[in-house]
């Protein structure tokens, strides 16, 4: 049994290393070659057992969708990174940004390869509902000061207030566009980008 456990941990470690190095998990054949197994069915068996142990999540609809859970990281002796939750950001009527860390949130394994500095902000309002960002959601943000047109960003307005909007640089101004047909864009001569939204966490599902 110990041999099976060690082989499973070897497979888990290889999946982790591959995602860290290239950003996506290996194929079953790559796992075979890496851990010295000749049968893909044997690897599938190990992956199923890792899933039963709660170390791995597989998506049956995607051939290479393997995600290591926090329990899996613990089994490998890897401490998950934590994302600081910083104040509240408004999607709708902006409010003053609060640059205080309120809490820490475990880094989702699918963002483990993100090289940037991440933080989270809680969204209040409905201005981004067409983009699937709802009131009370937490946006995961990569800290950066630039953005491409059409990207969803956290931006600071001229009044020193933070808001989540879709970013557009136009000829004479910047446009922070809501994803809600009932709301108007914010037009600014100057804008400070705090970061790009790279993920979303929802605590309540209605």
From Swiss-Prot:
Keywords: Autocatalytic cleavage, DNA damage, DNA repair, DNA replication, DNA-binding, Hydrolase, Repressor, SOS response, Transcription, Transcription regulation. GO terms for biological process: DNA repair; DNA replication; negative regulation of DNA-templated transcription; proteolysis; SOS response. The record marks 91-92 as: Cleavage. The keyword Transferase does not apply. Homodimer. Its EC number is 3.4.21.88. SUPFAM superfamilies: LexA/Signal peptidase, Winged helix' DNA-binding domain. PANTHER family: LEXA REPRESSOR, LEXA REPRESSOR-RELATED. The active site is at residues 127, 165. Represses a number of genes involved in the response to DNA damage (SOS response), including recA and lexA. In the presence of single-stranded DNA, RecA interacts with LexA causing an autocatalytic cleavage which disrupts the DNA-binding part of LexA, leading to derepression of the SOS regulon and eventually DNA repair. The lineage of its organism: Bacteria, Bacillati, Bacillota, Bacilli, Lactobacillales. It comes from Lactobacillus delbrueckii subsp. bulgaricus (strain ATCC 11842 / DSM 20081 / BCRC 10696 / JCM 1002 / NBRC 13953 / NCIMB 11778 / NCTC 12712 / WDCM 00102 / Lb 14). This is LexA repressor.
């Amino acid at each position: 049994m110990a041999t099976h456990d060690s082989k499973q941990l070897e497979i888990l470690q290889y999946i982790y290393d591959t995602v860290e190095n290239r950003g996506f998990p290996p194929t079953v054949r790559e796992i075979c070659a890496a851990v010295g197994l000749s049968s893909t069915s044997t690897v599938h068996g190990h992956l199923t057992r890792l899933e039963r142990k709660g170390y791995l999540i597989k998506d049956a609809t995607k051939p290479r969708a393997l995600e290591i859970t926090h329990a899996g990281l613990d089994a490998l002796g890897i401490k998950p990174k934590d994302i600081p939750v910083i104040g509240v950001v408004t999607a709708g009527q902006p409010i003053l940004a609060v640059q205080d860390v309120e809490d820490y949130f475990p880094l989702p394994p699918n963002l483990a390869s993100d090289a940037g500095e991440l933080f989270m902000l809680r969204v209040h309002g409905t201005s981004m509902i067409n983009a699937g960002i709802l009131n009370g959601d937490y946006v995961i943000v990569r800290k950066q000061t630039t953005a491409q047109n059409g990207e969803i960003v956290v931006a600071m307005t001229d009044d020193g207030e933070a808001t989540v909007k879709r970013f557009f640089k136009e000829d004479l101004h910047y446009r922070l566009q809501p994803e809600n047909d009932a709301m108007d864009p914010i037009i600014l001569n100057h804008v400070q980008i705090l970061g790009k939204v790279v993920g979303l966490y929802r605590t309540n599902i209605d």
